[in-house]
Amino acid sequence: MSKQQRRKGNAKNASSAAAHEYLAQGGATFVGLTPEMNIFEVASSNRLHQVVEIDDETRIVMKKLTKKDCQTREKGLKELMELINTENSSIESSYEHFCGLVAQLTTDGSPTVRMLTMKVISQFLTKLKKSASKGLKKIIPFVLFAKSDVTNGVAAAASAVIRDGFDADKKRQVVELFVPNTFDLAAKIAEGKHELSLPAEYDASEDLETRKMRLETQSLNTFLSYIKEYGNESKLWEEPARKLFSNSEFIKKTFAGKKEALKVQLLNISYKFSDNIEVILSNPVISTYIQASLDAQTFSTECATAWEGILILLPDERFHAKCSLQKGIYPRLLNLIRKKGNHWRVLKHYLLPAVSVLLQKLENPALITSIITSFTDNLPWQAEASMNAIHCWFCTFSDFVKWILGNDRINLEILKDLSPLIVEMSNQSMHFNTAEATECISGLIHWIIEKKVLENPAEFFDLLKTSIYEVAPPEKSRLFADSLTLPAKHLELAHLHGNLLSNPDVDFHIIRNLARASNSEYFEETCRNINNFEFIENSDRFDMLQAVEIVKLIEMKPSLSLQIKNNHVGRQLLLSENSEIWEKSLKNVPAGVFQEMVNFWHEKRNGKAIAQAVNFLKKMGIQLDTNAAAENVDFLISLLQSLDSKEDPEERKNLVLKLLSALFDAEDEPKLEHFESLKSHLNGDFEQFFEKLFANMEEEDAERVLEIAARFDKLVGFCDADSRGEIAGKMILGRREFDEMSEKLHFLELDVLTVSQHTTIITDALSRPIEHLEEKEATKMVKELGRLALFSVASNYNSSIHQLFAWQMIRVISALGNRYCLKFLDEELQQLRIELEKRVIKSEEIQKLINDGCCCAPNFITDTYGIPEKRQKFEEYSEDMDTKIETIYLKTDTPLEYVEKVFEASQSENSFPLFQFDQSKKYEWLANLTFVKRFIQCGGEIFRAENLEFRDFTLCGIITVLDTSTDILIDSPHSFSENPLLEALTTLYLELFVVLTDATKRGAYSEQSVEEWNEFYTPTIHTYCIRLFRTIRRDQQPTPFVRALLRALFVISEFPTSFSNDDDVANQEFIPELSVFKYPAFQESCIAQAFSLFASNNEHIQLIAYSVARLLMPIMFKLENAAALKSNEDSELPVSTNRRKLSLPVMISKSYPKDHHNPHVGPLLLDLTLLPLENTKDSGFSQEHRVAYCDVIDPFFKNALNALMLDQPFEFRQVPIGCRIPKSQERAYYLESDLSASPIFFDKFASRLLFKSMTLLPAAIRLFYKGMPNCFMPMFQETVTKYASRLLIEQELGKVREAKFEGEMKVRTVPVTGEIIAEYVVEETKMKLTIGLPPDYPLSVPSLTLDKAIVKTDRAKKWLLQLNAYLFHQNGAILEGIEMWKRNVDKGVEGVEDCTICMMTVHQQTHQLPKIKCKQCKNKFHSNCLYKWFESSNQSTCPLCRNNFT
């Protein structure tokens, strides 16, 4: 056992609970485990000794209540509460024990303990009810005491004990019964005579001084809270409190101390006595403290409490006898007024009452004068004084002056001293420059003017004017001057107001006060006192709001002549439309200034002002250019309202259309008055308005469409209830527009027809030629119609036609996404589809419209709405038609059963129209389309059919349809556009071919069935696919046929051989570079066709080109490199020095794009380039050929790799780099080849191609990386290391791990470190080669180490150098490098001589030994080394002896 465990065990054994358990097991009792054994429990031993025995669990809990740690006491109280709630039989005995601890717990140093104690008491009283009465004497006094606890939570819990523990009628009785004990307890604690004043020896929560202060405060609060609650109803508190005040030693000690809170509490208690003055005066220290605290500067309550006491004492003669009013209180009062400090916060409330009492007792006329003049003594204020105190000083002065002037009994001689005092206080208010101080003094002046109490007001206002102009600086006097002139009605202030306005730099508020003057007499008097009006002429300094006030002033005095500018004042004057101002100031203003004003309002989008100004100027004969404001709603509304009813209706309609466009195009929400103004002008015909609006909408956001719909609803909602439906019907989509728009979308119905599993409906439109739009044009159209559909269905005034249109557009958007499936659907179209799906509903009315043939493009609706199958009626009726239609709509349990039934019908006398293509007979097309759709559903189950004739018939049907379609399409390249149903049928049969091919690869079908499919049907269908490919054009759109052909071509693994040279080569493009290789005519035409399609702007067409070029690449490579692929390794001597080199197929280089318009073509061609390296067996590659081919493609590879980087699924411009590869999908992107068309096709293709390049050409990738600009290298390394290198290292290690080596060669891998360790035992000696792959492989070179070489060191180093060169420069694979190293070791041990040119045994490229022997010197050479010697020296002699080899 560890020391720590022993300590834990000892601690457990030391606990009282564990000890009791051990003793009980041994037969001992609890006797002997007394509190004396714990030094912290002695205090409770006496209490616990006298009560009845309690159970062990309760005793443990009780022990916790006396522990020194407050957390233990808290835990004990919580456990006790749980015991009380468990209905324990020992609750009563627990209660008796607890009562003995209440005194300690209710005064505990921890607030939590005190609060929990109150809750425990409350639980005991609730549980025990009457049984708890015997302990109330010990509990209730402390509960009442706790109601005054300094912690609010404890006080609230104590109040809850009384509230919840007793009935309502007994609460008062309980309080009165036990409160005397509480008062005695409180008095003793306050005097320090109670044992609870000292901290309990078990309580470590607070120190002595803190506990004493808390309990003393709580004790005095006990008296005050009782007095506050019961007031004069009870005097139970007086006797204990009087004893407290009779203890002169205690009172002196308290007031001599520094505990101001206790002093304030004692003062408040003394004020509550019925003979309070006698109690106060009996303790001189109290009255002394009161007088001394009248100017206390603290923010506590002692100052206010002292003033309460002085107001109690002042009227009483007994106080006068002990303290002279004339010599003591009066001088003290003057000092308090003269002193400028924080005590003014209190003095504000008590000065007037005190002075009033003092005046009654002292008949001294000079008293008031002394007091009022003392206000301005001892200035300036103390720096530490608060602004609140200063504001109180101002308010007190104002109230004092009003009190003096409003009291007739006071000598009016003081009036002569008031004027300078008020002026001085005005100076002080300007000095402090606060709103509160200014309002106090200016309000006093206004009051004095109203009361007319000044004998010489002119002199007073002269002093005031001098003070404003000369004493205070301008920035300080502005607020006071504004406040003084604000009412603008007292004529006494008009002279002052006029003088203030005569200053050119006068504050705007002074001007505003005059403009707002309601008293015309005051306005005229003020204007007479204005010396000049420069303050208005300098109009540039006023802002827009100020300009309104200035114009008011000018309108009140239109005689003023002003210079008008394009500023706020000038524009406001123009909008006033005042003829007097026009004649005086505006008439001669140049028109250019007015145009500038209009342009300004246009920038601020204030159309209302533009219209108002333009109309006014038009009346005055001035025309302005308003084109800039043509889209402003307020401007247009104002113009519309100003139109005369007799004017041209067409002009009115155009204006309404402009207004509608502006209203719905506005970014901000139009105002309600805009809708109100427009509602009366909606009587015209605006049916195509929203169609044009959405066609020209620049914002690509479905939310914007919803905003427009909400505005439309709001607009129509302002119209009369009876006309709303009619107006809405005129403006939004109608039946005719719905049909027209459905007609536009027919080119996408073909996409629905070929994928939908619902009933096919053959409409007249599908029998007519279809013009397929380009991607941008198609997307733009679908967006416009989608917006219109969302608007219509989102409006509250939508109908079933709008719902039908919305259902249709949901499928149209999906069809567009399917057509251009290599890209993600446009974000706005996604939003439109989501919003439409939220709002469409199904109803009987919509169902009826569909059944009645309301929809022109029903296949859209049937695919989304899911209507019940309804048999189509055909015009071409014959007697056997019913039977045929019955077969078409036949219900079967399985698709295979349906196909079989149709087969039987086709063999009957009625000759069911299968594989017949009469364009005029719709039912034949319906039969064929329905059949092939069910056949696709059937899938590989056809191979399980027991009826061989049925199976052969259906499979031969595929060949029949494709043969017919191919012949028709070759004869007429545009036949699919002219006959959409033929395209649909061909598409479905190509899909069927793909489905059946996949089924044979995955399904468990008989070998005979699969073999028959692969050997007979598949080659023929492959031939038709290639022939169909020959009809593809560069400008062709990705229609269902194009997409299906692409899927079918990706299924083909090699180019078909069953073609004659004359097949489909009539229109072959002649390419001189190809003609030199003498390709078969058909192959040459396919090559030319495939590589020409790479120039298409359509990605599906590019992929079709890639899919066919992928099949042709092995043929091209072998034919164009036929001479170079012939191996010369078996000949003894390479006599000829003109050996042919490998080359890249000519069409790959020729087809590489010269610009970046088609970014995917480069990577597609790069993948074709790597095919010979991927399939070395099919290409006839030797190691020498491989190295040579890598050298040949190097320039092309670097160029194509740059294009490949652009296609990678990374956002290199983001910080950090963004990745489009989903989490945990790295393997699917880098290791799996996925040729299914989807929006992530090129992301996956580029990722896989990069990984393939890293695998096949690691050295080329490394050199590409090293040649990158420095700014791109970290980004490339980060992405490769994070996503690809890990998988590549894992793949390389896997190849080595699965490889089998001959002899004593053992190879193991260490995946954690990326190491490969090759151990080779030769002649009982073990050699160890370690290859370490770095984390960013192949960007960094693997590390190579060799231990215990059995040959000379220089030779072992040569092997390592050769291996390093192979891996670093020649794109060698790790596994091949290990095998090369092993051959070097083997031949070195066998004694094989080195080639005397390269000085190596095994050739680095061909992995062959030196075989070519010189007849003269007998030295042997590698054939490749000798060939390079011949080529570089331009002669055929031995490099050593110079003997001629030829």
Swiss-Prot record:
Name of this protein: E3 ubiquitin-protein ligase listerin
PANTHER family documented for this protein: E3 UBIQUITIN-PROTEIN LIGASE LISTERIN, ZINC FINGER PROTEIN 294
Subunit field text: Component of the ribosome quality control complex (RQC), composed of at least the E3 ubiquitin ligase ltn1 and nemf. The complex probably also contains tcf25 as well as vcp/p97 and its ubiquitin-binding cofactors. RQC forms a stable complex with 60S ribosomal subunits.
Pathway(s) annotated for this protein in UniProt: Protein modification; protein ubiquitination
Highest rank taxon of the organism: Eukaryota
Gene3D superfamilies hit by this protein: Leucine-rich Repeat Variant, Zinc/RING finger domain, C3HC4 (zinc finger)
Cystines in this chain: none
InterPro entries found in the cross-reference section: ARM-like, ARM-type_fold, LTN1/Rkr1, LTN1_HEAT_5th, LTN1_UBC, RING-CH-C4HC3_LTN1, Znf_RING, Znf_RING/FYVE/PHD
Family: Belongs to the LTN1 family.
Native species: Caenorhabditis elegans
Zn finger region (RING-type): 1395-1442
Subcellular localization(s) per the UniProt record: Cytoplasm, Cytosol
GO function terms (MF aspect): ribosomal large subunit binding; ubiquitin protein ligase activity; zinc ion binding
HEAT repeats: 71-108, 115-153, 324-361, 363-399, 413-450, 630-669, 684-721, 1046-1083, 1107-1144, 1165-1202, 1251-1289
Record Pfam families: LTN1_E3_ligase_5th, UBC_like, zf-RING_2
Statement: the UniProt record of this protein carries the keyword Nucleotide-binding: no
PROSITE patterns for this protein: ZF_RING_2
